[in-house]
Amino acid sequence: KEGALENEKTMNGKNAAVVAINPKTGQILTMIGSRDYFDKEIDGNYNVTTALRQPGSSFKPFIYATAFNKGFTPDTVLFDLPTEFQMTCNAYGKALPGYSQSNCYMPQNYDGKHRGPMTLREALAQSINIPAVKLFYLSGLSDSFKTSESMGISTLTNVSRYGLTLVIGGGEVTLLDMTSAYGVFANNGIRNKYTGILKVENSEGKILEEFSLNEKEILPKNTALTISDILSDNKSRTPTFGANSQLLISGYDVAVKTGTTNNNKDAWTIGYTSSIT
């Protein structure tokens, strides 16, 4: 709570939520739905962990995982340059005669800069938007959507509704689903669906329900390890985040991805080790 209150002072973050899951079992270790359950000013009795929110760039690893499954590598190069993705618009993002300007799509990077050729490692580590949208297009919207769904994202029902904006957080997901899905990366490609119940007994002590491990391989181990390696690569993210950012946790090998929604309304940080997400 102290950290959340400090965030309100420094970043105008009026509320906060956190989920922690053991990726080896899927067991929920912590679920805090708001900063203060009794604070009516922030609707404290509302569980933000199960609310639909846009994930921003924290959705990108699902698209990169799909690409790595298809033969792309961390050393594959894409160009971070102004790019119009709609064929009915010109290279400068203006609609061609007879077509609507609203259909044009020329994504921007968060800082407005363009870095030219970038490896996929650099692009993901620094969370650069334009290469991510290009990779989403090249990997296939449908296949990328299936990857996120198989990893535990349950709220995106129609990829055509979002189009290319999905890679930079255009859909709505829950923190609980996102934490669980990142657990697949943490657990070397193996998914354990989240659970908050270990055992249910009746008044006579008879066990009605009991937790049992139910593992399912979702990603090739090498794909999961590659994503984890990039998200823990401080050198690759340094040009954007700096060498000593808050993403660097001294003494621990932690993979971290951030996400920020439009107008900084929501800020996500999802981090994991092999034992906690």
Predicted regions and their residues:
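Mid-domain, small-residue-enriched loop/turn segments at the edges of structured enzyme/sensor domains
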Residues: 92-94, 98, 102-107, 140-180
